[in-house]
A protein has these predicted regions:
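Conserved, single-site charged/polar hotspot
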Residues: 1-218
Length: 218
């Protein structure tokens, strides 16, 4: 309703140049960096028709809701990956694919079911053990009273209604006596649980605090 919105206008290659080291460690192998650059470029091109920020003349934001964009110092390794793949995107049947990616899997990759969408033919589940990652498993304690809502009333419980083969939550319900809120979209589930969450203990024992959403819906 009030305030200032800053909009940063950059060309796609400059955008990818800063997204790449923001989304993947610059120490990763060259081929991994190249693959990530192609994914990042494909993703941003596919968002060009996104109207979420049309009011501001923008297509995307700089968070995990789209892709993390930290306009900090670029790295030589990621710069080389961007240059080596300049202009390259992934398409299927003449159309850009929706190029989702993640930092850590729960033991296997997922299909589009986690976004309540049908799965294209080019996506297949594969084993992807990632148990050496700090984010492979995590724990957190939530205060149920934090979910009391003026519209719904006093929160009486949170239940997981459906999970995928890999363990991702596909449906989550917050109960309020005779009322309930049901969340089925991956980001909505992460935000619903993460909104009042103060501390997360990761797989390696390290602690993350004041996160805007939980690390995953798994």
């Amino acid at each position: 309703d009030a305030g200032i919105v800053a909009v940063n206008t950059v060309d796609v290659e400059t955008y990818v140049r800063y997204v790449l080291p923001s989304e993947m460690p610059s120490t990763f192998d060259a081929e991994a960096l190249k693959a990530q650059a192609v994914c990042a470029r494909t993703f941003v091109y596919s968002q060009m028709k996104n109207t979420q920020y049309a009011l501001y003349g923008a297509n995307i934001d700089n968070t995990t809701a789209f892709q993390v964009y930290n306009a900090s110092e670029a790295k030589q390794s990621t710069d080389e990956a961007v240059k080596a793949t300049a202009g390259q995107v992934v398409s299927c049947g003449g159309s850009l694919i929706t190029c989702y990616y993640f930092s850590t899997s729960a033991g296997k990759t997922e299909d589009m079911e986690v976004w309540s969408s049908s799965t294209p033919d080019f996506i297949h589940k594969v084993e992807s053990v990632d148990d050496n990652s700090p984010y492979y498993r995590w724990t957190s304690e939530l205060d149920l009273s934090a979910y009391n809502d003026p519209q719904y009333g006093t929160a009486t419980g949170i239940s997981v209604d459906k999970t995928s083969d890999a363990g991702y939550v596909l449906s989550l319900t917050i109960n309020y006596g005779n009322k309930s809120q049901v969340f089925t979209a991956e980001n909505d589930i992460r935000k619903a649980l993460g909104h009042y969450q103060k501390k997360v203990t990761l797989n390696d024992g390290s602690v993350r605090e004041n996160m805007s959403m939980i690390p995953s819906a798994c």
